[in-house]
Amino acid sequence: MAKPKKSDEEVSIDSDSLKIKVAKEAAKLIKDEMVVGLGSGSTANLFIQELGKRVIEEELYIYGVPTSFDSRMMANQSGIPLISLDQCGEIDIAIDGADEIDKKTFSLIKGGGGCHTMEKIVDYYAKEFVVLADESKMVDSLGENTPVPLEVIPFSYSTVLSKLLKINAAPAIRSGSGKMGPVITDNGNMIIDVFINIEDAEETETMLNSIPGVLENGIFTKCDKVLIGTSKKVEVLKK
C-alpha cells in the first residue's frame, strides 16, 4: 500500500517544528557580552524568542542589532536590549534565515520579507554569519525556485526593469498586501523580484548591484555556517 501524502497543514507543522529545533540550537551559540545581529523572517523570529528566554532566565548580558522594524519589535517583546550599528563598534555573530541555500557553496537567497539590504549590512559586518533553515531550503542550484529580490530606488524602477530584460532576466515588481501598489521597504524603496540564471553567485551578486538604481540584491555569499533542521537532528554545516 502506498504511503499517504501529507496534507499542506501537516507539512507546515513539520516545517515549523524543525525551525523551532534549529532556533533553540542557535540560541546556544550566544555567550555573555556578545553583540548579536538579529535577522528577519519567521526562522529568525523564533531564534530571537529563544534568545530572549536565555536573556531573562540566565541573565545573559548581550546586545542585539536588529535588521528590520519587524526584528526590532520581536526583540523588544522578547526582552533583548538593542543597540544600533553605529553604536556597537563590531558584531560578534549574526543569526539569520534563508529562502534558498546552495548545497555546495552555501550561497543563499534572502529577502522574501523585503529586508535584505539591512540584513546584508549586518550579516556581512559580523565576525561570524550563521544561517538557520530546515532541510527543504537546501537546493542543488541557487535560484531554482526562488527569485532574487532587488531593493530599487523608486526614481529608477523603469530603467532597472529595462536593464534586467536586456540581460534575459524575468523581473516583476513586488505588490503589497493590505494596500494597493508595490511593496515599500523599511528604507522607502521598491522591491523587484527577478528570476535569473545564477552560474556563479558572487559574480551575479556583483553584477546586479552594478545596475544603477539597485540599492542591494538578495544573493548572500559570505555565510560561515549553516544549521539545518532535519527530522533526526540539527546538522551543522561549515565551509
Curated annotation (Swiss-Prot):
Binding site for substrate: S40, G41, S42, T43, D96, G97, A98, D99, K110, G111, G112, G113, K137
Family: Belongs to the ribose 5-phosphate isomerase family.
GO terms for MF: ribose-5-phosphate isomerase activity
Protein known as: Ribose-5-phosphate isomerase A
Entry keyword Isomerase: yes
Catalysed transformations (reactions): aldehydo-D-ribose 5-phosphate = D-ribulose 5-phosphate
Signal peptide: none
One GO-annotated biological process of the protein: pentose-phosphate shunt, non-oxidative branch
Active site, per annotation: E119 (proton acceptor)
Organism: Methanococcus vannielii (strain ATCC 35089 / DSM 1224 / JCM 13029 / OCM 148 / SB)
